[in-house]
Amino acid sequence: MNDTIAAVSTSSGAGAIGIIRMSGPEALTISSSFLFSKNKFLSPSEILPRTAIQCVFQIGDRKIDQILFFYFKSPNSYTGEDLCEFHFHGNPILLREALDAIFRAGARPAKQGEFSRRAFLNEKLDLTEVEAIGRLISARSRFELELAQKNVFGEVTRFTSNLRSQLISLKAECEAEIDFSTEDLTYESLEERKTRIENVKSLCQTLISKSSSAEKLIQQFRIVLYGEPNTGKSSLMNVLLGKERSIISEIPGTTRDYISEEIFLEGIPVRLVDTAGVRETTDHIEKLGIERSEKEFQSADVRLFLVDVSKKENWKEFINKSRERLEGSILIANKIDILNSSWDRNLFSDVKDLIVLEISCKTKEGISNLLDAIKERTGKLGHSEDYVLLEERQRYHFETIVRCLDKTLHLLKEGAPAEIYIQEINYALAEIGEVNGKVDTEEVLGRIFSKFCVGK
């Protein structure tokens, strides 16, 4: 890291501002050769750290742009090195010209993620925080963004620090027992030691479970609207989307294939699927649509089974015919605004794991209850503070820690001496080092930073 790197750190294309970032031992010297103010180029000694300098970026005698310049002196910068930022007007041609001049002056083009790599190597960030920055940049929903923010501010770092502290304490107790076995000292009982290990293992398992739930939410739940023609599936689709997406018609069979759209529930992306109405038909195209409806319904995370409550008469026959599909679904009794006679929702009391709701797509009655039921049915929609997000690499290491602790417990129960099972504790500690990058992780670093943009 003895050289100086530079890159555009804002997104490509025109914009109000375009930023060039430069980091390394020659960053300030190179920068000063372009900063023109009060009829002269600024010397490095005139440039104060953490101060906004309004000046002209000038190449020789050619003025390029009015800019703001910032200098962050090592080690108090993002990378831990001398770091400079040029804030231009965001024209890509202008930025390219300025960057080429910076390269000619002695900087080299930064590689993907090289600024963050230097921050990691200079211990400004640990590996989990670096990965969180990548997730922060690419987050597709508010939920994912909030989870990434938690990790940027050290959620996983604090967890691994606590985990490491507990395992080191456990290891110290075991080593004392080994080294001073002939001394008249009192140590914790085997049961107490087992309990401590179980507690640490439980912490890891809870973390993994929370991450799995979060990942499921990020990858999108599929909510499928299913039922006979003209039960209001397309109308409900439009109501939930807040726009006219599905074609609505009184003619049965209007929807021939499924239609899907993304909606957000409490900042969490959800895929909403409107399917073709299910009925007996001789139309080949409609049959194909119905087959797809069945497949979508069976693979759904949340199944909304719609019925037109104003027309349905033989409820017992309907229940007997549809029982298998009703189990685990949300039955939506639609069109209650035109219901002429009462209906008995208790008819469904013996259908396993069924929620029954009454709504009107026309008046919007019951829609808020439906949204609540969807959240209840998933059992996972909630606030980001209830979750933590692990990258796949991190999750692998935490799962390995659990296996090490399982083996430790097994050895304890078998009566193995501390000299044997302490090795498993050492393995678990090594895995913690892999999580936050406190070991030699060159290959891992290459994979992580290859996903970053050049200016990061």
Curated annotation (Swiss-Prot):
It comes from Leptospira interrogans serogroup Icterohaemorrhagiae serovar copenhageni (strain Fiocruz L1-130). SUPFAM superfamilies: P-loop containing nucleoside triphosphate hydrolases (SSF52540). CDD domains: trmE (cd04164), TrmE_N (cd14858). The lineage of its organism: Bacteria, Pseudomonadati, Spirochaetota, Spirochaetia, Leptospirales. Exhibits a very high intrinsic GTPase hydrolysis rate. Involved in the addition of a carboxymethylaminomethyl (cmnm) group at the wobble position (U34) of certain tRNAs, forming tRNA-cmnm(5)s(2)U34. This is tRNA modification GTPase MnmE. Its EC number is 3.6.-.-. PANTHER family: TRNA MODIFICATION GTPASE GTPBP3, TRNA MODIFICATION GTPASE GTPBP3, MITOCHONDRIAL. Its main location: cytoplasm. InterPro entries: G_TrmE, GTP-bd, GTP-bd_TrmE_N, GTPase_MnmE, MnmE_dom2, MnmE_helical, P-loop_NTPase, Small_GTP-bd. GTP binds at residues 230-235, 249-255, 274-277. The gene is mnmE. Its cofactor is K(+). It is found in: Cytoplasm.
